Each structure stands twice: as C-alpha cells, then as structure tokens.
Regions:
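Flexible, substrate/cofactor-facing loop regions flanked by secondary structure
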Residues: 108, 163, 222-223
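Active-site-adjacent substrate/metal-binding segments within catalytic domains
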Residues: 1-5, 9-17, 22, 82-95, ...
Length: 227
C-alpha cells in the first residue's frame, strides 16, 4: 500500500498509527510513501503533518510572496501487488520514456521500466498510441532495468502550435496476466539554445516570453478547488 502526495507545502511528515513513514522537503514535487508494514487489520490512523516554516534548506528561501502551507493537490492511496512498477524510484511512476526525432521523419522512443520483486516469469509490454488511439509500436521484454527502443514512422512533432502527444503504456505481465500497468504521455521534439538564435524548437527559432503568474487564489491559496 502506497500513499501518493502530489504536493505538500513546504515540509511534510507522514505517520501511520503514530509511526513515521517518511519526511519530504519541498512543496512542489510529488512523493510516495510505502505504508504496507505500518497498516494492520481494522481501523488505521493516517496523519500528514505539514508546515510552511521558512528554512534555508528548502526552496524558495525568500521572495516577495507568501509561502502557503498545506496539501493543495489531494492525496491518493494506491494498492499494488507484491511485484509492481517501482514507486520508490525518484518519485516517478516506475517508467521513463525518452523520445528522439529521427532524420527520416520518424522517431525512436527509448523506454525504461523499474520493477520491484521481479523474477524470470515477468515481462513488460510497451505499447505506443497516437492521438487518434491507433497503436503505432509495440514490444515485449523481460522485466529488468534494460532499455528497449521502439521506432514510430512519420512521427508528428510536438510544438506550441501543434502539441501532438503519444501515449505510452507499460504492462507488467506474468504468463499473459497483467499485474500492474502505468501510462504516460510524451511529445517528440528537439531543442537547442544558441547565442545568436536563442531557443530553437524543432529547427525553428522560437521566442520565449516569461509570464509572472502565480497559482495562488484569493481565500484559496494554492488550491483552486476544495481539497
């Protein structure tokens, strides 16, 4: 059993039945806590202590706006089998997808997965679908931490005018039975930064204009809706 906290400002300590499970610093990144061994049959007490005290070890250390405290993106309980995509891997979903455009107009997707308590009977199936839901690439490999590369012909690039996305699904399987599944979306693009042309997106100069916009709302703080 995992507890997912998408964001807690600015420092959070998770306790289950009075026992500390994890302490996380930083109010803008998600984190997971494995609370399996701290739970028992019947009722359990879950406490998340959150504080927004200004300390030099957490960003931002000082600014001209208020550092609100609290849970502003909700909290989720996630139940997974004993063998699952690793939720303890740097706060991610257990998979990493890196798309790269190819010279022939296609794209390669470098896929990596991280599985907990795996053995030789487990495999990971990768499936890539375009914006219309059509499967454009698929591959199966053993459930270890080696990467697998999938090729998508005539890939549509992501840009600000045409934000094309691909959906990558990883299924953890054992003898054709799915044990765990995660899905992520990604776009194919290339970018460089040069002194003369500044930011280059997909080979085209692209002006970057920053906007000073805070997510805070009157009487609501960082949370736009009731939590």
């Amino acid at each position: 059993m995992y507890l997912e906290v998408p964001a807690a400002a600015l420092k959070a300590t998770v306790k289950v039945n009075g026992v500390e499970a994890i302490t996380h610093e930083g109010g803008f990144s998600a984190f997971w806590a494995d609370i399996t061994d701290l739970c028992h049959a019947g009722d359990n007490e879950l406490v998340i202590e959150v504080g927004n005290e200004n300390t030099p070890t957490m960003y931002p250390a000082s600014a001209d706006f208020t550092f609100y405290g609290g849970l502003y993106r909700g909290v989720n309980l996630i139940s997974v089998p004993a063998t699952h995509f690793d939720l303890d891997y740097f706060g991610g979903p257990g998979i990493k997808v890196t798309p790269k455009s190819a010279m022939d107009g296609g794209a390669v997707f470098v896929n990596e997965s991280y599985v907990t308590n795996s053995d030789e009977n487990f495999t990971v199936q990768y499936s890539i679908r375009d914006a219309d839901g059509h499967e454009v690439a698929v591959a199966v490999r053993p459930a270890d931490q080696t990467a697998v590369t999938l090729y998508v012909p005539q890939a549509k690039l992501w840009s600000m005018d045409e934000p094309n996305l691909y959906t990558v699904t990883a299924r953890l399987q054992r003898r054709n039975e799915t044990w765990d599944e995660v899905t992520t979306c990604t776009g194919v693009r290339s970018y460089t930064v040069t002194p003369l042309e500044s930011f280059i997106l997909n080979g085209q100069p692209t002006p970057l204009r920053g906007v000073s916009r805070h997510q805070n709302r009157l009487y609501k703080g960082k949370r736009p809706d009731r939590c």
